[in-house]
């Protein structure tokens, strides 16, 4: 424009709306040519005294509430401020205020099995109770931890040391261990830590249920030379083997959950126990039945499969090579 151009000509040449040029000129005269701070001024913005009230309540109640959500309700509960939890969180972040995290319990360490407990069948048993609510019954199941054989079960309306004693007595009799257990306990030398001490007949693994840790159960186990091993509280993975068995029973035989007659439940559990031990291939022990593993046939069956797979591969290779040699070669004159 200093060169004689009019404002309209200059705007047309610069492809600039004349209205915008007028606005810039007015802002220059007012000393506001520099860009203002971006963003508007929301009408619902929190007031300065409200932010101060939030920070004050934080100082007083942070150790009690430990959450911006609770602090937002604490403010209205005390009549100090009324705003949303997100607003409280934003004000605290801008004020560099943070809640102190709650102290976390230390991580527990799983207790290993004792060294004398061999990883062979009839050395480590695991047991637990599961519920069938349709008939209001509790089933205590004992499983061999190594072979995964379902040893025995007891259906009862109670969960006491009596059921534990009866179930273990039946399992020891079925496995032919009861007389040996009584004889070993009668020597009075069952002490794996002593130099001349005898090892317990087996290790019984369980959770910390009242019937498992009771004095009567402990006395019964001592009389039969059975050592006890308990998992960590509230840690069902320490008893994953028996938890898996309970889940498998209810998942693969779901009709058991609908039985309302305890006598029918007992009969059906006997049928399911036979199918589980003798028919169903168990993935956890290499796809053999628990009876196979418990009676020592498991490794032979697994080796026979490996040998059969290798033999079948060689047979397929030989067959395909022979068929290829029988085909005429079009390139041969």
Q: What do the predicted segments below correspond to?
A:
Residues 22-124, 184-190, 235, 294-303:
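Basic, flexible linker segments flanking DNA-binding modules
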Residues 4-6, 66, 83, 260:
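Residue-level signal for the short linker/turn that defines the boundary of a DNA-recognition helix
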Residues 49, 77, 81-82, 86, ...:
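Mobile-element integrase/transposase regions
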Residues 222-226, 248-333:
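C-terminal domain-tail junction helix/linker
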Residues 7-14, 71:
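Short alpha-helical "recognition helix" segments of helix-turn-helix
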Residues 6, 17, 98, 227:
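Residue-level detector of anion-binding/catalytic polar loops
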């Amino acid at each position: 424009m200093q060169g004689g151009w009019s404002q309209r000509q200059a705007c047309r040449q610069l492809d600039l709306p004349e209205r915008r040029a007028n606005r810039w000129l007015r802002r220059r005269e007012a000393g506001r040519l520099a860009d203002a701070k971006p963003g508007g001024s929301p009408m619902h913005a929190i007031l300065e005294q409200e932010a101060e009230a939030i920070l004050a309540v934080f100082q007083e109640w942070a150790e009690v509430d430990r959450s911006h959500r609770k602090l937002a309700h604490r403010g209205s509960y005390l009549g100090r401020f009324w705003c949303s939890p997100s607003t409280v969180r934003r004000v605290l972040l801008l004020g560099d205020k943070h809640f102190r995290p709650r102290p976390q319990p230390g991580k527990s360490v799983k207790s290993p099995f004792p060294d004398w407990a061999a990883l062979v069948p009839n050395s480590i048993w695991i047991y637990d109770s599961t519920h069938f609510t349709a008939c209001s019954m509790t089933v205590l199941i004992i499983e061999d931890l190594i072979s995964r054989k379902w040893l025995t079960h007891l259906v009862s309306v109670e969960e006491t040391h009596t059921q534990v004693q009866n179930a273990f007595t039946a399992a020891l009799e079925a496995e032919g261990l009861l007389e040996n257990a009584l004889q070993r306990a009668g020597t009075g030398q069952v002490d794996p830590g002593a130099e001349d001490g005898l090892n317990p007949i087996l290790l019984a693994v369980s959770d910390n249920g009242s019937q498992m840790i009771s004095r009567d159960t402990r006395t019964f186990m001592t009389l039969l030379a059975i050592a006890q091993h308990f998992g960590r509280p509230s840690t069902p993975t320490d008893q994953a083997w028996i938890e898996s068995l309970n889940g498998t029973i209810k998942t693969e035989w779901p009709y058991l959950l609908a039985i309302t007659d305890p006598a029918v439940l007992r009969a059906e559990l006997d049928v399911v126990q036979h199918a589980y031990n003798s028919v169903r291939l168990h993935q956890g022990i290499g796809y053999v039945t628990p009876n196979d593993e418990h009676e020592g046939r498991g490794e032979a069956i697994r080796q026979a499969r490996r040998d059969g797979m290798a033999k079948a591969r060689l047979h397929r290779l030989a067959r395909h090579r022979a068929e290829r040699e029988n085909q005429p070669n079009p390139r041969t004159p």
